[in-house]
Amino acid sequence: MSASAFNFAFRRFWNSETGPKTVHFWAPTLKWGLVFAGLNDIKRPVEKVSGAQNLSLLATALIWTRWSFVIKPKNYLLASVNFFLGCTAGYHLTRIANFRIRNGDSFKQVIHYIIKGETPAAVAAKQTASTSMNKGVIGTNPPITH
């Protein structure tokens, strides 16, 4: 590629509607950090991966991937980053679901775990602890006499 052809291509990129002088370039470029963080989470134990966070990332990825083809100018960089963000979030949600099902949870329990982040045993333990604490507190204080 000759120098003049390179200069022309660079100038066209620099001054384009989705070039580095616009938010249409920088927002998707910086959003790749979320994709790389999701890829790094593959090494984390599945118990440490947040279902609610990945569900949110999947939802935003689906919405913004579609939106990037609707807006003018079409933003393929935004579409690509959101597509891969959705892929990593979907992968983590699949990991969580498979892990919970292997541990004996039903589909309903898996959905509850993804949204709330609590296992049924943890919910039951929390309810037991709160009822036992309430039994010990209510009505046990002696009356105040002066």
Curated annotation (Swiss-Prot):
Disulphide bond pairs: none
Subcellular location: Mitochondrion; Mitochondrion inner membrane
Coiled-coil region: none
Entry's Gene Ontology molecular function annotations: pyruvate transmembrane transporter activity
GO cellular component, one term: mitochondrial inner membrane
Result of knocking out the encoding gene: Grows more slowly in amino acid-free medium (SD), when combined with disruption of MPC2.
Induction: Mainly expressed when grown on lactate containing growth medium. Expression regulated by osmotic and alkaline stresses. Under the control of the SKO1 transcription factor.
Record's keyword annotation contains Transport: yes
Anything else known: Present with 6750 molecules/cell in log phase SD medium.
Family: Belongs to the mitochondrial pyruvate carrier (MPC) (TC 2.A.105) family.
Function: Mediates the uptake of pyruvate into mitochondria.
Stated name of the protein: Mitochondrial pyruvate carrier 3
Gene name of this polypeptide: MPC3
